[in-house]
Amino acid sequence: MNREQPIVVLGARGMLGHVVVRCLREKGWSVIESDVRWTPQNAEPEIRSLQAKRVGAVVNAMGSYIQDPDARERDSMQWINGRFPTILSATLSPQTLLIHASSDAVFGSRASGCLWNDSFSPDTDYGYSKVVAEKGLVGPQRWVIRASLIGPDGAHASKRHLIS
């Protein structure tokens, strides 16, 4: 990947995404901020549209966390956190680098002190949704970054949170 190839950031206005955009630009990378409202109906055509731009990498910083989801919210969370990343991975060219933001919630309540190759043991719907995504990201150009982020949402939130 070279600096002429743009990096697309999905979820560019969220808690993690806006910081990723800022850091990449500070380092001199060309960044495309995606503001697409991803749905099961538009996912594959929109991903193909990204491919047509000949992007060098896609950073999936989207995510949904719902403490006590009802059935409809749970379905939405499973789609954004679990199913969408697997579709993204399968639809992008195998040569396009995909960096996916996951969570230590894949390890459940024993998340503290886990290693990257420990077995999954989610104990929440959120953790399970992140496991679904990780299992769908297969190949050398598919990277997973697990983090435990706690803080306000979006670019206009207080700058006193963990990443800023």
Language-model features and meaning:
Residues 10, 34, 61-62, 98-104, ...:
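SDR active-site strand-loop-helix element
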Residues 2-26:
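N-terminal Rossmann NAD(P)H-binding glycine-rich loop of SDR-like oxidoreductase domains
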Residues 40-80:
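NAD(P)H-binding glycine-rich loop region in Rossmannoid oxidoreductase-like domains
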Residues 30-40:
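A short beta-strand-loop structural module common to alpha/beta enzyme folds
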Residues 135-164:
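NAD(P)-dependent short-chain dehydrogenase/reductase
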Residues 72, 76-84, 116, 120, ...:
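Glycine-rich NAD(P)-binding loop of the Rossmann-fold in SDR/ketoreductase-type enzymes
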Residues 86-121:
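Conserved Rossmann-fold NAD(P)-dependent oxidoreductase catalytic core, especially the SDR/UDP-sugar
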Residues 68-75, 109-112, 155-156:
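Conserved catalytic-core motifs of eukaryotic protein kinase domains, centered on the activation segment
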